[in-house]
Amino acid sequence: MFIDRAKIYVKAGDGGNGCVAFRREKFVPRGGPAGGDGGKGGDVIIEADENLDTLLDFHYKRHYYAERGEHGKGKNQKGKDGEDLIIKVPTGTLIFDAETGELIADLVSHGQRVVVARGGKGGRGNTHFATSTRQAPYFAEKGEKGEERWLYLELKLLADVGLVGLPNAGKSTLLSKISNANPEIAPYPFTTKTPNLGVVEREDITFTVADIPGLIEGAHENKGMGDEFLRHIERTLVLVFVIDAADLVTPPQKAYEILKKELYLYSPKLLEKPRIIAINKIDLPEAQERLPEIEKWLKNEGVPYVFISAKEGINIDKLLELMEKYVRERKESIPVVEVDKEIQETKEGRVETEEIPEVIREKDLWILKDKKTESLANKLDLYNPQAFSYFSNYIKRRGIIKLINRAKVKDGEKIKIGDYIFKYNAKTNSLEILE
C-alpha cells in the first residue's frame, strides 16, 4: 500500500543522573568526591533510504523513543551514553514540526539524515561541585530531559519524468512498456489509485518515470484526490502529457487544456517545466480518422509531440528519445549542489544565541525566562541545602537577583524558575524555596 503522509511522535533519551559518591579506599581516610557524570541521552535521527517507497510503516507504529543515558557511578565512572534511534524514511520525505508547521528537513539524497529530537545531557557528578569551602558535596545534577515533539512526514516522489493525463489515458500501460514497473492495468478509469515509479535504462543514462493517477477537472481542489497526486510531480524535471486520441467524450485538445489548467491552478511553476505531448492509442480506428486534425492543432501548439500506441509499442522509441533529450538538458542546466549528509549536527549540539534573561508577570506569579538558569534549577534537587546554596550563589553571579529588583518584585511574591516556585525575601534580597 502506498502511503505518503504520516504523523509520528519522537522522544529523545533523557540524560543519566550524576552520581554522589566518595572515595572509599584503604589508607585514604578522608577520600574526596568521586561521583561520575551521567551519560547523554540518545538522539532521534531520521535518515533517507532509497530502498523505501512508502510511509506505510508509520501508520502501524507512531511513537518512537531513543535510549536514555546511564547514571554516573562511583570512582568517577561516567554513565554510558544512550544509543541513537535512527528512523528510516523514503528519499523525497519532507519533515515538518506538527505544532508550528515549520519545515525541519527535506531529505532528497540517500543517506541524508537530520536530528529531530536531541538527547538530554548527562548530569554532572558531585566531583564537579567540590571547592575549598565545600570539600564534600552531597549533591549532583540530574540528567536533562530529552526533546520530544510530534512530526508530520510528507513524501514527494523523486522522479525525472512525470506522466500526467486524464483517467484511462494509458499512462500505466506506457510506464510498463518503457520501464521495469508493473502497475495494475485495466480498461476502466481510475485503475491507478497511487503513484507508480519505474526506471528507464538507456545506453548511457538511467532515469525514473512517475505515473501519476488520472486527473479530473477540479483536481487542484482535491477532486478525485487530485491534490494528493499533483504534489508528486513538483520535483520532476520533465512532464509528459499522455492524451487519449480515441476519447470521444473529451477530445485531445480539450483534455490538454484541462490538464494545463489544473497544473497551473495547483502551482504555476509546474507549467514552467519542459513538456512533451504523447498522443496515445493511435492504433484504434476512432483515433486514426482524427490524426490529421490533431496534428494540425499540435503544430500550432508549439510543444514537442509524438503519436504513440503504448499497447502496441508504436513510436515508443521516439518518445524515449524525447524524454532522454529533455532529462539530459534539464540535468545539465541545474547546478550541481553538494547535499549535506548531516542536515544538523548530531553530537556537538546546536549553536544557540545567548538569550537575555527577563522576569515577567503572569497573574499572581512572576516567571523567570532564562534557559540556562531554568535548566540548572531542574537538574538540581533544590531541597538539598548544599544544592540550594550552590544555586543561590549562581543566580547572584548571573545577575538574576538584580533582574528581580529591577522588575520591582515585592516582598513575599512568588517567582517560578524551571519547575520550582520560590518566595522573594526583600529583607535578605534572596529567594526562599517553597515546599
UniProtKB/Swiss-Prot annotation:
Residues 343-426 form the OCT domain. GO terms for biological process: ribosome biogenesis. It is found in: Cytoplasm. CDD domains: Obg (cd01898). One of its GO terms (cellular component) is cytoplasm. Its cofactor is Mg(2+). Residues 1-158 form the Obg domain. Monomer. This is GTPase Obg. It comes from Dictyoglomus thermophilum (strain ATCC 35947 / DSM 3960 / H-6-12).
